[in-house]
């Protein structure tokens, strides 16, 4: 097992105009670990995954992959593969042709690159000669995973890999990721599904408004019973108070109505 970290990020900041997508993010991922990124839409998960894949560069902070500092060039770091916002596929090509084209870009033919092997790993052998334009979302996700596996990555980066998967497809993908981790590959994935995180991840990082609010073992998160405060802006504060009062484990910690232009409540849960 490698002793160096697959990913080491310190103080990573990324802005898009006036929008701060990542604000001082730290992240450690070890080899053989499946690390989940969790958070609401707009939390910064996809931006962080894009940095790991070389699709963007941080404005500040330090990012190391496999112990090597990531430079300012837009390039996929060595040993890294994956996708964000869904895999990029050629819709007019078959599944096999898509993978063969990717192999050719790396100077390999389909046989030596192991195209048939990765198709089998993700359960697409029976549709290998079907055009990608007819694939369901789940099939496209699995083909994207197969494309990443062609490179035999040491770090696999996946954005919502379970999207669109039926139970059989999810079992297949989970099996692939678990096996890769057992072989020493680091996997970083985002997911909105707690069942995916519980089934796959040993560590999770929770992002909110571009900041890390928790990072550590999933078991520690499950045992964490700290209360959190949420500031809610509402046009119906009376109804919100009644709803909070009638919900077990939820209460109004502060009433900011009248102190702001909009009615606001701080709800503790």
Predicted regions and their residues:
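ABC transporter nucleotide-binding domains
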Residues: 4-7, 14-209, 214
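Intrinsically disordered, low-complexity segments enriched in small/polar residues
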Residues: 9, 15, 30, 34, ...
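C-terminal coupling/interaction segments
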Residues: 3, 268-269
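ABC transporter nucleotide-binding domain
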Residues: 174-268
């Amino acid at each position: 097992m490698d002793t160096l970290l697959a990913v080491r990020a310190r103080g990573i900041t990324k802005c898009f105009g006036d929008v701060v997508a990542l604000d001082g993010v730290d992240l450690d991922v070890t080899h053989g670990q499946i690390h989940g990124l969790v958070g609401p839409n707009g939390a910064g998960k996809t931006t962080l995954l894009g940095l790991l894949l070389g699709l963007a560069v941080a404005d500040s902070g330090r990012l190391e992959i496999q112990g090597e500092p990531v430079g300012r060039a837009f390039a996929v770091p060595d040993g890294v593969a994956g996708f964000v916002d869904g895999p990029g596929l050629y819709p007019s090509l078959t599944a096999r042709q898509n993978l063969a084209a990717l192999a050719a870009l790396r100077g390999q033919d389909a046989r030596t690159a192991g195209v048939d092997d990765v198709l089998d790993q993700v359960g697409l052998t029976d549709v290998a000669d079907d055009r990608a334009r007819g694939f369901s979302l789940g099939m496209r996700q699995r083909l994207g995973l197969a494309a990443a596996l062609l490179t035999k990555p040491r770090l696999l980066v996946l954005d919502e890999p379970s999207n669109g998967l039926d139970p059989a497809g999810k079992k297949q993908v989970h099996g692939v990721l678990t096996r890769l981790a057992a072989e020493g590959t680091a996997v970083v994935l985002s997911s909105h599904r707690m069942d995916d995180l519980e089934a796959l991840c040993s560590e999770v990082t929770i992002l909110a408004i571009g900041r890390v609010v928790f990072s550590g073992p999933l078991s520690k998160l499950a045992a964490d019973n700290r209360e959190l405060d949420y500031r809610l802006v509402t046009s119906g504060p009376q109804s919100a108070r009644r709803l909070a009062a009638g919900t077990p484990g939820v209460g109004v910690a502060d009433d900011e109505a009248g102190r702001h232009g909009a009615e606001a409540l701080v709800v503790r849960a």
